[in-house]
């Protein structure tokens, strides 16, 4: 969601859709990572109990790079707002005052996901598909078929049948990004770090990425045909 999802939202709906998708990412990325850490901890072989296990969970959540990045970004935004209130303008801006560093970080950001996919591709083995075929089929179907069907379907139903929530065309690219994006590249890294099944996680990332090319296209076409996405 944080990387592929925002690019997908931009392609489907432009700047307005990116704004909505960014708001979704700000809440869902920390939530998903916290739930992932909890899941790995609950189903791990760690025999710790009580306070010790709770401390371990909190420590792993606090050390998660994506969660740290989200809260660091929020802190930077708060500091920017504080500067404007205190001085009437932004006194220091990374983009303005350290342009070389800002440009370098931007270039680095653009290669992170492709590089991670290349690394995962190097670890991918077709022989493992035979051992994990049921898990791969179930995981991929749930992630890129059932998840968007339930999530986006619920959004359409809420908008059409109730007056509680109304989703505009700017919201649906973000919802496609949230519910229809493939398994995150970082999940394989997290599985390795937390003694999970790294090979299965790698298989899910690769196969969901390949299959999502078709499911996202079909989803976008259906929503365009029904007027939920701009043509």
Regions found by a protein language model. Give the residues of each.
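Alpha-helical transmembrane segments of multi-pass small-molecule/ion transporters
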Residues: 1-231
